[in-house]
């Protein structure tokens, strides 16, 4: 029956809906690892870098291009960040690319990402993360920088960087405790263990948890609601709600990340991950 409905164009890509959300990127964005789509006053940034939507320098550049395009538009009120891969949201940073950069390169990368995420947080544009499955490491940090996080029931969140001998570099040591409290954030960051969508909701990391097949409709419903709000009021609510020492905390995280990233343990953790073996950390 499903094959027949797809053949008839009543389900699947031809129908415009499919069994899971399907990106319809604007011209010029078809080959980008992050694709831009617009629906009325809503922009959608589709993470589309197979196989795992891993965050590489190219993905960071693409996210920045999307944000510059969206924030420069007078019509866009909401940005939804979603995955074009139905099996995951974002598995984290591209570990292989880490082997090609030194401590200075790592610092430049974190500067770029933090600059982007802080721009998102300071903007009058509301941001929504539609987390359909795995959101680990940088993927979790990207979601945390959004104003609203809608999670599918099968989603999971985690900060596994410590298993590589490094620390979260995109805000995980700062935004996570602000969202779920210091004790739970320390547990996640020190163990690297993921949590379920339901736990994320109970902790305060996810605003809503919905059945997988309702995720996209729910995210769009939130987006349409937020797009009707006054942009100046949105910006000031976001600004006042985030008042505090987040910038100082992020600066401390950036310095700590660069220091740890250049360590022998970090090289061992990354190498062990790529070689699919357990790391042997020596405290150096």
Model-inferred region functions:
Residues 150-155, 197, 206-252, 258-264, ...:
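C-terminal long alpha-helix characteristic of the crotonase
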Residues 192-199:
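Acidic, divalent-metal-coordinating active-site segment for phosphoryl/phosphodiester hydrolysis
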Residues 92-93, 176, 184-190:
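Short helix- or helix-capping micro-motifs
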Residues 28-82, 86, 104, 118:
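Conserved CoA-thioester-binding segment of acyl-CoA-metabolizing enzymes
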Residues 1-39, 57, 268-270, 275:
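NAD(P)-dependent Rossmann-like dehydrogenase/reductase catalytic/cofactor-binding core
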Residues 83-118, 135, 165:
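Glycine- (often His-adjacent) and acidic-residue-rich active-site loop
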């Amino acid at each position: 029956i499903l094959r027949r409905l797809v053949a008839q164009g009543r389900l699947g890509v031809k129908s415009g809906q499919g069994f899971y959300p399907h990106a319809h990127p604007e011209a010029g964005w078809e080959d980008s690892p992050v694709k831009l789509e617009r629906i009325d006053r809503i922009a959608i940034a589709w993470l589309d870098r197979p196989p795992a939507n891993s965050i590489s320098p190219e993905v960071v550049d693409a996210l920045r291009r999307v944000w510059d395009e969206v924030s420069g538009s007078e019509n866009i009120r909401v940005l939804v960040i979603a995955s074009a891969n139905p099996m995951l949201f974002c598995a984290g940073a591209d570990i292989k690319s880490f082997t090609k950069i030194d401590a200075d390169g790592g610092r430049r990368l974190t500067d770029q990402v933090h600059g982007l995420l802080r721009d998102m947080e300071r903007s009058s544009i509301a941001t929504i993360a539609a987390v359909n499955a795995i959101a680990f490491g940088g993927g979790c940090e990207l979601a945390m920088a959004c104003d609203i996080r809608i999670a599918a029931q099968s989603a999971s969140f985690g900060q596994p960087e410590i298993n590589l001998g490094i620390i979260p570099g995109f805000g995980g040591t700062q935004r996570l405790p602000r969202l779920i409290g210091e004790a739970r954030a320390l547990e996640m960051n020190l163990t690297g263990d993921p949590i379920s969508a339901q736990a994320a909701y109970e902790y305060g990391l996810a605003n809503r948890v919905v059945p997988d097949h309702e995720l996209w409709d729910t995210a769009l419903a939130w987006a349409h609601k937020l797009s009707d709000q006054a942009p100046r009021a949105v910006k000031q609510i976001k600004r006042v709600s985030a008042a505090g020492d987040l910038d100082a905390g992020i600066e401390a995280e950036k310095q700590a990340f660069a220091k740890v990233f250049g360590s022998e343990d970090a090289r061992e953790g990354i190498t062990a991950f790529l070689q699919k073996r357990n790391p042997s950390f020596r405290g150096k």
